[in-house]
């Protein structure tokens, strides 16, 4: 959140925050902060509520861990993605996947995220629960125009998490993106973009 505040301060004006997954939770923590909410003029939560669904979250972590030892080729990485997202047609040209991979000295391709993100989470339960409680409190303080976007096939923002968020932020608008999973932008980018533009056009400052 501190990094986000610094970026907005450099812009010199309030920001409409659009956050997916972890980015959504960071945006929520700012928009509902007692002091720093002054930097936010609007909030769009993309397939995330005050907490992720536990089963869906575990599935993502398992996918990330499955690539911890890297891939022999871009094709092998593409196979892993196809296994995780079986509903999405595998593109004929997979060269775009290279931007998400790093070729290291051992000749293998690795996802570019920080491996520390995947360290053993044993004993972190209380810490995570406290963070989620803070997000619940933040949600109750939200006063700016808000939109919650849900991928209809999502296992991260299920109907349970959706209803919890809408109850905490009763003025929030809601948009469901059909045939989209948690990866809303990658699944149905055109429909997602239309929902975002419509909301911002109505509420932008």
Residue ranges and their predicted role:
Residues 1-10:
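Alpha/beta-hydrolase active-site loop
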Residues 10-55:
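Conserved hydrolase catalytic core segment
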Residues 72-125, 129:
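Conserved alpha/beta-hydrolase catalytic His-Asp/Glu region
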């Amino acid at each position: 959140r501190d990094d986000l505040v610094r970026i907005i301060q450099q812009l010199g004006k309030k920001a409409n925050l659009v956050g997916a997954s972890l980015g959504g939770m960071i945006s929520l923590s700012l928009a509902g902060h007692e002091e720093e909410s002054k930097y936010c003029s609007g909030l769009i939560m993309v397939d995330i509520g005050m907490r992720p669904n536990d089963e869906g979250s575990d599935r993502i972590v398992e996918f990330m861990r499955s690539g911890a030892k890297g891939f022999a080729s871009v094709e092998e990485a593409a196979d892993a993605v196809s296994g995780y997202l079986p509903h999405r047609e595998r593109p004929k040209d997979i060269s775009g996947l290279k931007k998400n991979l790093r070729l290291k000295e051992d000749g293998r391709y690795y996802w570019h995220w920080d491996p520390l993100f995947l360290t053993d989470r044993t004993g972190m339960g209380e810490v995570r629960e406290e963070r989620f409680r803070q997000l619940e409190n933040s949600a109750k303080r939200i006063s700016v125009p808000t939109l919650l976007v849900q991928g209809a096939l999502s296992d991260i923002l299920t109907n349970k998490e959706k209803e919890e968020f809408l109850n905490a932020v009763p003025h929030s608008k809601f948009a469901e993106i059909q045939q989209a999973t948690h990866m809303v932008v990658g699944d149905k980018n055109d429909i997602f973009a239309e929902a975002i533009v419509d909301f911002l056009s109505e509420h932008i400052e």
